[in-house]
Regions:
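Glycine-rich beta-to-alpha active-site loop
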Residues: 74
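Conserved hydrophobic/aromatic pocket- or pore-lining residues that grip, position, or stack substrates
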Residues: 27, 67, 89
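Short coil/turn segments at beta-strand junctions that form active-site/ligand-binding loops
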Residues: 62-63, 111
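Short, glycine/charge-rich flexible loops or terminal/linker lids adjacent to PRPP-binding catalytic cores
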Residues: 77-115
Length: 123
């Protein structure tokens, strides 16, 4: 698992870590924002970040069935985490401001999903 410092170094080197004042889609405010598209321009670095996230998920969520990623920016990150953890991965999309399952995706009753909407960077 990458150290927090190493993760931030990768995000800075790929210009994925933006610093300033951001109002996230949830309405939360943040002084930092991770632009996943920038990170994904560097597959080997993105793989390291995703592997580290996957290990953290595995450590903190012992029993789960699938990864639920947000569209659009989180789809590739979710895919890579699912690949590493060997878990089904689906994504949701915003429809009128609410995350919604579309494209035939369903979550079976009783299934446990790990979901994320904002990956916030802090020091």
């Amino acid at each position: 698992m990458l150290s927090h410092k190493k993760s931030l170094d990768i995000l800075r080197k790929t210009n994925a870590l933006l610093e300033g004042h951001f109002i996230l889609s949830s309405g939360l405010h943040s002084s930092k924002y991770i632009q996943c598209a920038k990170l994904l321009s560097y597959p080997s670095k993105a793989e390291k970040i995703c592997k580290s996230l996957a290990l953290k998920i595995k450590k903190n969520f012992r029993k789960f069935d699938l990864i639920l990623a947000p569209a659009i920016g989180g789809i590739v990150i979710g895919y890579e985490i699912g690949r590493i953890l060997k878990k089904e991965t689906i994504f949701c999309e915003r429809v009128k401001g609410k995350f919604t399952l579309r494209r035939g995706f369903k979550i079976k009753r009783g299934s446990k999903a790990v979901s994320y909407t904002h990956l916030r960077a802090h020091e």
